[in-house]
Amino acid sequence: MSRYRGPRFKKIRRLGVLPGLTSKRPRSRSDLQTQLRFGKRSQYRIRLEEKQKLRFHYGLTERQLLKYVHIAGKAKGSTGQVLLQLLEMRLDNILFRLGMASTIPGARQLVNHRHILVNGRIVDIPSYRCKPLDIITTKDKERSKALIQNYLVSSPRGELPNHLTIDSLQYKGFVNQIIDSKWIGLKINELLVVEYYSRQT
């Protein structure tokens, strides 16, 4: 299944706020209105929607997300927590969380177009897994710096998660540590995502 490129507002109307996909927010709707519009949700549908939230927020294909679930399942600790950590430490997401891109798709474009360096080397793989002590910078070219500056100025600045630091003047971000679960950038029940995939096998 390919990466979603359709109307973004349609997705947030169904799934709720997805800051990685778009900065737009759906109009508030009561739980009763939602239930009347979409009908009573089955347990399967609830699990499916949580999985879709994760997929669309981080901009993944179904195959990519399944791969991350398998990796998380083999790691020590809670599969759901490890899954979220893996997704949060992707380079495209780190750029987004630093405010160097307004959305994760925007961050992915910066990486694909070779504007981004990690530890002084160009990295053009959005899924690159960042590690503690990584230093993320832009190419020393006017166009690259202009793109990042535009994002830093125009992006709404939320509270920076404690595993990251940004030096806006130097167009430089620092990864201090692995992300703590309370700083995950999406309201999600990751256990339902794990359950969804465990029931598919």
UniProtKB/Swiss-Prot annotation:
**Keyword hit for Chaperone:** no
Q: Which segments does the entry list as coiled coil?
A: none
Gene Ontology cellular component list: chloroplast; small ribosomal subunit
Which Pfam families does this UniProt record tie to the protein? Ribosomal_S4, S4
Chief location bin: plastid
**Compartment(s) of residence:** Plastid, Chloroplast
The reply to whether Hydrolase figures as a keyword in the UniProt entry is: no
UniProt keyword terms in alphabetical order:
Chloroplast, Plastid, Ribonucleoprotein, Ribosomal protein, RNA-binding, rRNA-binding
Q: Start and end of every S4 RNA-binding domain?
A: 89-150
> Which InterPro entries does the record match to this protein?
Ribosomal_uS4, Ribosomal_uS4_bac-type, Ribosomal_uS4_CS, Ribosomal_uS4_N, S4_RNA-bd, S4_RNA-bd_sf
Domain of life of the organism encoding this protein = Eukaryota
Molecular function in Gene Ontology: rRNA binding; structural constituent of ribosome
Q: Name one GO biological process term.
A: translation
Quote the HAMAP family the UniProt record gives: Ribosomal_uS4_B
Name the job this protein performs: One of the primary rRNA binding proteins, it binds directly to 16S rRNA where it nucleates assembly of the body of the 30S subunit.
- Which family does the entry's similarity section mention? Belongs to the universal ribosomal protein uS4 family.
Partners and quaternary state?
Part of the 30S ribosomal subunit. Contacts protein S5. The interaction surface between S4 and S5 is involved in control of translational fidelity.
Q: What is this protein called?
A: Small ribosomal subunit protein uS4c
Gene transcribed to yield this protein: rps4
